């Protein structure tokens, strides 16, 4: 199984072929444009399934598969926790068939509520999705944008 995560820093439409060549089972792409902006070059296999979340079409989190994996957003999803998305990944073509794993796809970024910026989002997501991550095997992956050297204020949801 090939799982990868990458902060593409925008303009995924110009970089997507770099990921497609590996045909990953699961790819979590941060700062990813809306898939509606993607155009696949001749000879490049497009993803077989994807979900995408973002506040605008320029940057969000994209979760893609180039194999048999399909994605469903878990009902516990809380849109107020920006860019921390609980996803059920299922292998196999039939709904409900095959193996399942959970993904918590993360792109920690700025937020208008200071306490929810960067690591604050991740902290809140871990609390909110506690039951989700314990349901079945789970991958928590993405860009945490987290480093203690950036902490200027000590707060509960910090390093």
List PLM regions with ranges:
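Active-site-proximal beta-strand elements of phosphoester/diester hydrolases
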Residues: 1-9, 98-112, 141
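Short catalytic/ligand-binding loop motif for oxyanion handling, primarily in non-cytosolic enzymes
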Residues: 12-14, 35-38, 111-113, 147-151
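Surface-exposed cleft-lining segments at the edges of enzyme active sites
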Residues: 73-74, 104-123, 148-154
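Metal-dependent phosphoesterases centered on the DNase I-like endonuclease/exonuclease/phosphatase
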Residues: 120-159
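N-terminal, active-site-proximal structural segment of metallo-dependent hydrolase catalytic domains
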Residues: 1-44, 53-55
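Soluble or luminal CAZymes and related metallo-dependent hydrolases
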Residues: 7-11, 79, 114-128
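Glycine-rich phosphate-binding loop signature in dinucleotide/nucleotide-binding domains
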Residues: 22, 95-98, 131-136
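Structured beta-strand-rich core segments of catalytic domains in phosphoester-bond hydrolases
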Residues: 32-110
């Amino acid at each position: 199984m090939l799982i990868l995560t990458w902060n593409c820093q925008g303009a995924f439409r110009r970089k997507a072929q770099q990921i497609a060549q590996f045909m990953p089972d699961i790819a979590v792409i941060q700062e990813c444009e809306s898939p509606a902006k993607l155009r696949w070059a001749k000879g490049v296999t497009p993803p077989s399934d994807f979900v995408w979340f973002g506040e605008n079409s320029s940057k969000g989190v994209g979760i893609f598969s180039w194999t048999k994996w399909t994605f469903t957003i878990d009902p516990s999803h809380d849109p107020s926790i920006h860019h921390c998305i609980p996803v059920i990944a299922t292998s196999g073509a039939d709904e409900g068939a095959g193996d399942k794993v959970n993904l918590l796809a993360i792109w920690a970024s700025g937020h208008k509520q200071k306490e929810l910026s960067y690591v604050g989002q991740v902290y809140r997501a871990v609390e909110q999705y506690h039951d989700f991550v314990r349901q079945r095997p789970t991958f928590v992956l993405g860009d945490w944008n987290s480093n203690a050297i950036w902490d200027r204020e000590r707060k509960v949801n910090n390093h």
